[in-house]
Amino acid sequence: MTDNHIDVLINGCGIGGAMLAYLLGRQGHRVVVVEQARRERAINGADLLKPAGIRVVEAAGLLAEVTRRGGRVRHELEVYHDGELLRYFNYSNVDARGYFILMPCESLRRLVLEKIDGEATVEMLFETRIEAVQRDERHAIDQVRLNDGRVLRPRVVVGADGIASYVRRRLLDIDVERRPYPSPMLVGTFALAPCVAERNRLYVDSQGGLAYFYPIGFDRARLVVSFPREEARELMADTRGESLRRRLQRFVGDESAEAIAAVTGTSRFKGIPIGYLNLDRYWADNVAMLGDAIHNVHPITGQGMNLAIEDASALADALDLALRDACALEDALAGYQAERFPVNQAIVSYGHALATSLEDRQRFAGVFDTALQGSSRTPEALGGERSYQPVRSPAPLG
């Protein structure tokens, strides 16, 4: 692109920003994506595409490619508390699609970036950042200067820049305290045991332990664990994995014994930032946000990646209307928030209720909702928020 007038400037190229750029490019809009990191970077993100996220991927024309690239189709989940089966559910009872897909977030992002390469109206600028902005008399961002000296004049700016969002903090002056959970979460990759290939299994116990076993690709398995902070530190300090295996054996049943045996050390585990957040305002003037810039959900829901790409789909539709002058930008962004806030609110609040009830079997069983866990977006399922304290994060705008 040689003209500095563009339709949308997206700051951040995680899965949400990449998906938004691709969807807008397919609609013919002129988009520039700015990302501080390199194109090929390791993202320690989610691995689950649930039915709500699969619908976005399918509408974008990417579903067949996802399965060709090793996305693993799954149908069932078992949930245990203190070693006893608490819930079994098949996704066919939650959604007509009847399945979910296991695929690393970075693999999906890489696929989307390859598709963007074929979109003439989308430009990707890696290892680049916003340096300054200029506003017009209506306080809308009129001009953006990048650190490479380029000056862009976008109609809309989007913050898809994660938990520490520059757009949220510096452009919208929203300073929100993200509330971390007291028990850290870690993920490791190991050899695939037959029991993990058979079925996804989630285990929790009355001492605040959590272990989730699932396959990734066709020869590896993921193990996600969470324990109270000091216990987690001690377990990870034994790099041979003996302490962790003994701890897992206290609440993981014999059906996953082979999976425990495959945990040959702790050096492969990496931390996952976890906290809870849902802003009460997703936009202001000609600036909008999506994904982790506006909400954080506990990974026990398995929906972080899904919420980000659902946001991207809804925002792409809203911006398409405004950019075609089918409605005012303010109305389009208000519609985006009206569509996404109730969904994000329900899932963030549901995840918080689950994460804070692990120790209490009866309470955990009462909170666990197969419809929400399976990513149902029906009003009846989302209305379940009434059964637990909603998470809200006021975002006063100047």
Locations of the language-model features?
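Glycine-rich FAD pyrophosphate-binding loop
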Residues: G25-G45
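Conserved mid-domain beta->alpha element of the FAD-binding
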Residues: C13-A21, R268-A353
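Flavin (FAD/FMN) cofactor-binding core of flavoprotein oxidoreductases
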Residues: R74-E78, A262-L277
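Conserved N-terminal helical subregion
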Residues: T2-I6, R55-L171, E177-T189, G241, ...
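C-terminal helical "tail/cap" subdomain of flavin- and related membrane-associated enzymes
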Residues: D3-H5, D317-G398
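Conserved N-terminal glycine-rich FAD pyrophosphate-binding loop of Rossmann-like flavoproteins
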Residues: R38-E58
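Conserved FAD-binding catalytic core of PHBH/FMO-like flavoproteins
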Residues: T128-A132, I141-K270
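Conserved Rossmann-like nucleotide-cofactor binding loop
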Residues: G16, R39, A164
